[in-house]
Protein backbone atom coordinates (compact mmCIF):
# COMPACT_ATOMS: atom_id res chain seq x y z
CA UNK A 1 0.00 0.00 0.00
CA UNK A 2 1.43 3.34 -1.00
CA UNK A 3 1.76 6.33 1.28
CA UNK A 4 -0.91 8.86 0.34
CA UNK A 5 -0.53 12.46 1.52
CA UNK A 6 -4.08 13.04 2.66
CA UNK A 7 -3.99 10.08 5.06
CA UNK A 8 -1.84 11.89 7.60
CA UNK A 9 -2.70 15.15 9.35
CA UNK A 10 -0.89 18.12 7.86
CA UNK A 11 1.81 19.89 9.83
CA UNK A 12 1.06 23.31 11.20
CA UNK A 13 2.87 26.58 11.53
CA UNK A 14 1.54 29.75 13.08
CA UNK A 15 -0.66 30.76 10.18
CA UNK A 16 -1.98 27.38 9.12
CA UNK A 17 -1.17 24.33 7.11
CA UNK A 18 1.77 23.57 4.89
CA UNK A 19 3.93 20.64 3.71
CA UNK A 20 2.07 18.93 0.89
CA UNK A 21 3.92 15.90 -0.46
CA UNK A 22 3.18 13.79 -3.51
CA UNK A 23 3.06 10.06 -4.00
CA UNK A 24 6.14 8.57 -5.63
CA UNK A 25 4.32 5.55 -6.96
CA UNK A 26 3.28 5.56 -10.61
CA UNK A 27 1.12 2.44 -10.42
CA UNK A 28 -2.62 2.96 -11.01
CA UNK A 29 -4.53 4.25 -8.02
CA UNK A 30 -6.73 1.38 -6.85
CA UNK A 31 -10.36 2.00 -5.94
CA UNK A 32 -13.04 -0.12 -4.33
CA UNK A 33 -16.58 1.03 -5.15
CA UNK A 34 -19.41 0.23 -2.74
CA UNK A 35 -22.91 -0.03 -4.23
CA UNK A 36 -26.42 -1.01 -3.19
CA UNK A 37 -28.54 -0.49 -6.29
CA UNK A 38 -28.29 0.57 -9.91
CA UNK A 39 -24.63 1.51 -9.81
CA UNK A 40 -24.94 4.78 -11.74
CA UNK A 41 -21.94 6.22 -9.92
CA UNK A 42 -19.96 3.06 -10.66
CA UNK A 43 -20.89 3.31 -14.34
CA UNK A 44 -19.81 6.95 -14.44
CA UNK A 45 -16.42 6.13 -12.92
CA UNK A 46 -15.91 3.23 -15.33
CA UNK A 47 -16.65 5.56 -18.24
CA UNK A 48 -14.30 8.27 -16.95
CA UNK A 49 -11.48 5.77 -16.47
CA UNK A 50 -12.07 4.25 -19.91
CA UNK A 51 -11.97 7.72 -21.48
CA UNK A 52 -8.65 8.51 -19.82
CA UNK A 53 -10.21 11.19 -17.62
CA UNK A 54 -9.42 9.49 -14.31
CA UNK A 55 -6.02 7.92 -13.65
CA UNK A 56 -7.23 5.02 -11.54
CA UNK A 57 -8.44 1.46 -11.71
CA UNK A 58 -11.43 -0.07 -9.99
CA UNK A 59 -9.95 -3.10 -8.26
CA UNK A 60 -13.13 -4.24 -6.52
CA UNK A 61 -16.87 -3.67 -6.37
CA UNK A 62 -18.66 -4.48 -3.11
CA UNK A 63 -22.45 -4.73 -3.20
CA UNK A 64 -24.76 -4.93 -0.20
CA UNK A 65 -27.31 -6.79 -2.33
CA UNK A 66 -27.03 -9.78 -4.63
CA UNK A 67 -29.75 -8.26 -6.83
CA UNK A 68 -28.13 -4.84 -7.24
CA UNK A 69 -28.27 -3.90 -10.91
CA UNK A 70 -24.88 -2.26 -10.59
CA UNK A 71 -23.25 -5.68 -10.41
CA UNK A 72 -23.89 -5.94 -14.14
CA UNK A 73 -21.68 -2.89 -14.74
CA UNK A 74 -18.89 -4.61 -12.84
CA UNK A 75 -19.34 -7.80 -14.84
CA UNK A 76 -19.38 -5.92 -18.15
CA UNK A 77 -16.13 -4.16 -17.21
CA UNK A 78 -14.60 -7.39 -15.87
CA UNK A 79 -14.16 -5.92 -12.41
CA UNK A 80 -14.04 -8.37 -9.48
CA UNK A 81 -17.20 -8.07 -7.38
CA UNK A 82 -18.36 -9.46 -4.06
CA UNK A 83 -21.70 -9.35 -2.25
CA UNK A 84 -21.64 -8.59 1.48
CA UNK A 85 -25.22 -8.83 2.77
CA UNK A 86 -25.95 -7.07 6.06
CA UNK A 87 -28.50 -9.75 6.99
CA UNK A 88 -25.74 -12.34 7.18
CA UNK A 89 -23.98 -10.56 10.06
CA UNK A 90 -24.94 -10.20 13.70
CA UNK A 91 -23.66 -6.65 14.04
CA UNK A 92 -22.74 -3.57 12.06
CA UNK A 93 -19.14 -4.02 13.16
CA UNK A 94 -18.99 -7.57 11.78
CA UNK A 95 -20.58 -6.40 8.53
CA UNK A 96 -18.08 -3.56 8.26
CA UNK A 97 -15.11 -5.77 9.04
CA UNK A 98 -16.09 -8.10 6.21
CA UNK A 99 -16.29 -5.22 3.72
CA UNK A 100 -12.95 -3.72 4.65
CA UNK A 101 -11.22 -7.09 4.75
CA UNK A 102 -12.19 -7.54 1.10
CA UNK A 103 -10.75 -4.08 0.43
CA UNK A 104 -7.50 -4.95 2.17
CA UNK A 105 -7.13 -8.16 0.21
CA UNK A 106 -7.71 -6.23 -3.03
CA UNK A 107 -5.00 -3.74 -2.07
CA UNK A 108 -7.19 -0.70 -2.60
CA UNK A 109 -5.98 2.82 -1.89
CA UNK A 110 -9.40 4.43 -1.53
CA UNK A 111 -12.97 3.25 -0.92
CA UNK A 112 -15.62 5.09 -2.94
CA UNK A 113 -19.23 4.94 -1.81
CA UNK A 114 -21.55 5.04 -4.79
CA UNK A 115 -25.14 4.92 -3.58
CA UNK A 116 -24.22 2.59 -0.73
CA UNK A 117 -27.19 2.56 1.63
CA UNK A 118 -25.84 0.55 4.55
CA UNK A 119 -24.08 2.16 7.46
CA UNK A 120 -20.53 0.98 8.07
CA UNK A 121 -18.00 1.44 10.83
CA UNK A 122 -14.75 2.64 9.30
CA UNK A 123 -11.68 0.93 10.81
CA UNK A 124 -8.63 2.92 11.86
CA UNK A 125 -6.55 1.86 8.86
CA UNK A 126 -9.20 3.28 6.52
CA UNK A 127 -9.67 6.62 8.28
CA UNK A 128 -9.69 9.36 5.60
CA UNK A 129 -9.63 6.65 2.94
CA UNK A 130 -13.39 6.43 2.37
CA UNK A 131 -15.26 9.01 0.30
CA UNK A 132 -18.94 9.56 -0.30
CA UNK A 133 -21.13 11.79 -2.43
CA UNK A 134 -24.38 13.27 -1.16
CA UNK A 135 -27.02 14.84 -3.45
CA UNK A 136 -27.31 18.10 -1.52
CA UNK A 137 -25.09 20.82 -0.10
CA UNK A 138 -24.00 19.47 3.28
CA UNK A 139 -24.82 20.42 6.05
CA UNK A 140 -28.30 20.96 4.55
CA UNK A 141 -30.67 18.07 3.80
CA UNK A 142 -28.34 15.39 5.05
CA UNK A 143 -28.02 12.78 7.77
CA UNK A 144 -30.05 9.75 8.74
CA UNK A 145 -32.99 9.22 6.38
CA UNK A 146 -31.83 11.67 3.70
CA UNK A 147 -31.06 9.59 0.64
CA UNK A 148 -32.24 9.24 -2.94
CA UNK A 149 -35.40 11.11 -3.87
CA UNK A 150 -36.09 11.88 -0.21
CA UNK A 151 -33.37 14.51 -0.41
CA UNK A 152 -34.86 16.23 -3.45
CA UNK A 153 -38.38 16.09 -2.03
CA UNK A 154 -37.11 17.81 1.12
CA UNK A 155 -35.31 20.45 -0.95
CA UNK A 156 -38.49 21.27 -2.87
CA UNK A 157 -40.70 21.20 0.23
CA UNK A 158 -38.41 23.67 2.00
CA UNK A 159 -38.33 26.01 -0.98
CA UNK A 160 -34.60 26.61 -1.24
CA UNK A 161 -33.31 28.11 -4.49
CA UNK A 162 -29.94 26.35 -4.64
CA UNK A 163 -29.08 22.72 -4.03
CA UNK A 164 -26.25 20.59 -5.40
CA UNK A 165 -23.92 17.80 -4.40
CA UNK A 166 -21.13 17.31 -1.89
CA UNK A 167 -18.12 15.01 -2.06
CA UNK A 168 -16.74 14.36 1.41
CA UNK A 169 -14.62 11.98 3.40
CA UNK A 170 -16.84 9.53 5.25
CA UNK A 171 -16.59 8.99 8.97
CA UNK A 172 -18.75 7.08 11.42
CA UNK A 173 -21.65 9.54 11.26
CA UNK A 174 -24.03 10.03 8.35
CA UNK A 175 -22.91 12.75 5.90
CA UNK A 176 -20.54 14.22 8.46
CA UNK A 177 -16.91 13.94 7.31
CA UNK A 178 -14.74 16.75 5.92
CA UNK A 179 -15.98 18.28 2.66
CA UNK A 180 -13.69 17.96 -0.36
CA UNK A 181 -15.76 19.88 -2.90
CA UNK A 182 -19.30 20.95 -3.69
CA UNK A 183 -21.19 21.84 -6.84
CA UNK A 184 -24.26 24.08 -6.87
CA UNK A 185 -27.41 23.34 -8.88
CA UNK A 186 -30.25 25.90 -9.16
CA UNK A 187 -33.73 24.81 -8.15
CA UNK A 188 -36.27 25.74 -10.83
CA UNK A 189 -39.84 26.79 -10.14
CA UNK A 190 -41.27 23.87 -12.10
CA UNK A 191 -38.90 21.22 -10.73
CA UNK A 192 -40.13 17.85 -9.57
CA UNK A 193 -38.05 15.47 -7.47
CA UNK A 194 -37.29 13.59 -10.69
CA UNK A 195 -36.14 16.57 -12.76
CA UNK A 196 -34.10 17.97 -9.89
CA UNK A 197 -32.50 14.59 -9.22
CA UNK A 198 -31.48 14.33 -12.87
CA UNK A 199 -29.71 17.69 -12.83
CA UNK A 200 -28.02 17.03 -9.52
CA UNK A 201 -26.81 13.69 -10.83
CA UNK A 202 -25.22 15.43 -13.80
CA UNK A 203 -23.31 17.59 -11.32
CA UNK A 204 -22.33 14.46 -9.39
CA UNK A 205 -20.93 12.88 -12.56
CA UNK A 206 -18.40 15.71 -12.79
CA UNK A 207 -17.82 16.40 -9.09
CA UNK A 208 -16.94 12.86 -7.99
CA UNK A 209 -14.23 12.26 -10.61
CA UNK A 210 -12.84 15.75 -9.95
CA UNK A 211 -12.57 15.03 -6.22
CA UNK A 212 -10.86 11.72 -6.95
CA UNK A 213 -8.41 13.45 -9.29
CA UNK A 214 -7.49 15.88 -6.50
CA UNK A 215 -6.91 13.01 -4.08
CA UNK A 216 -4.88 11.00 -6.58
CA UNK A 217 -2.74 14.07 -7.34
CA UNK A 218 -1.94 14.48 -3.65
CA UNK A 219 -3.55 17.91 -3.52
CA UNK A 220 -5.97 17.20 -0.67
CA UNK A 221 -4.63 18.42 2.67
CA UNK A 222 -6.34 18.46 6.06
CA UNK A 223 -6.35 21.45 8.35
CA UNK A 224 -8.29 20.33 11.42
CA UNK A 225 -11.65 19.27 9.93
CA UNK A 226 -11.26 21.48 6.87
CA UNK A 227 -9.92 20.25 3.55
CA UNK A 228 -7.54 22.51 1.66
CA UNK A 229 -6.75 22.01 -2.02
CA UNK A 230 -3.05 22.55 -2.68
CA UNK A 231 -1.96 24.23 -5.92
CA UNK A 232 -1.15 21.91 -8.80
Q: Which residues make up each language-model segment?
A:
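One-carbon transfer enzymes
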Residues: 2-232
Amino acid sequence: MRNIPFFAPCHHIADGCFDVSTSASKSPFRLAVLISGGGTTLRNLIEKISAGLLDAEIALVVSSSSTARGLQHAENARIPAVVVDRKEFLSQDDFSQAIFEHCRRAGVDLVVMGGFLKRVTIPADFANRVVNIHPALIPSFCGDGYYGHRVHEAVLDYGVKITGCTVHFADNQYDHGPVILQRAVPVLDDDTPETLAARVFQAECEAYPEALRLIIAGRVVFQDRRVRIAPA
